[in-house]
């Protein structure tokens, strides 16, 4: 029984390692350029192990999206410990700014996957990528709602659209300063908002 439990634990650990590797490599290289061998190399496992856990590249993409979702849930759970919605939203923006060098090289992990997947005909995985972004939008809207800001869904859309835009430009221009400058503008915008304010704060 112990051996069986150990085997299952090792298998689960290996799958998690492969999933994390898939998320990193797909973010850095994109879907089309990434091979299963790339994932194996990043996870430091034989390529046969990748085939054992993930039969197709689409399964790896799905696993990477679940990794992004888990990372987002971990991030928002940490932010939820902060005392006020304004604090939480500002800390979210600060987390984006802290990732400026990664954004300059590779863009937003989920956003870049969503754009790449949208070009495919089947339309299933792009919906899954959209669901991760929707999760962030919903959390952000909930913060504005709790804060008492009118039109919380609109404010959430403004904030997340700004993030996607600054990630795209930071990546396209290979300039981390774009993320810093635009992130600072968002922090100032959040500081200017008060409950009962109109949308443009």
Where are the language model's segments positioned?
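N-terminal intrinsically disordered/low-complexity leader segments
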Residues: 1-13, 196-201
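Helix-loop "lid/cap" segments that line or gate small-molecule binding pockets
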Residues: 78-79, 95-100, 109-120, 146
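Hydrophobic alpha-helical bundle segments that form small-molecule/ligand-binding pockets
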Residues: 120-122, 130-156, 190-200
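Helix-turn-helix
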Residues: 17, 21-59, 63
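Hydrophobic alpha-helical segments that form the core
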Residues: 110-115, 151-172, 185-189
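Short, basic, alpha-helical segments at the C-terminal edge of helix-turn-helix-like DNA-binding modules
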Residues: 66-72
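N-terminal positioning helix adjacent to the helix-turn-helix/winged-helix DNA-binding module
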Residues: 7, 14-17, 21, 155
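Hydrophobic alpha-helical connector segments
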Residues: 63, 74-106, 156-159
């Amino acid at each position: 029984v112990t051996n069986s439990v150990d085997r299952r634990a090792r298998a689960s650990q290996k799958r998690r390692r492969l999933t994390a590797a898939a998320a990193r490599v797909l973010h850095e290289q994109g879907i089309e350029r990434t091979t299963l061998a790339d994932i194996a190399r990043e996870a430091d496992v034989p390529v046969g192990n990748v085939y054992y856990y993930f039969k197709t590249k689409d399964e790896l993409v799905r696993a990477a999206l679940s990794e992004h979702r888990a990372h987002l849930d971990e991030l928002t759970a940490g932010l939820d410990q902060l005392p006020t919605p304004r604090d939480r939203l500002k800390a979210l923006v600060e987390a984006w700014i802290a990732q400026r060098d990664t954004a300059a090289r590779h863009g937003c992990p989920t956003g870049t996957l969503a754009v790449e997947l949208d070009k495919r005909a089947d339309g299933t995985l792009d919906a899954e990528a959209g669901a991760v972004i929707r999760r962030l939008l919903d959390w952000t809207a909930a913060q504005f709602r709790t804060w008492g800001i009118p039109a919380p869904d609109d404010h959430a859309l403004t904030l997340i659209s700004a993030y996607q835009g600054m990630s795209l430009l930071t990546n396209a221009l290979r300039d981390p300063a774009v993320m810093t400058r635009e992130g600072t503008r968002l922090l100032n915008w959040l500081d200017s908002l008060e409950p009962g304010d109109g949308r443009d704060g």
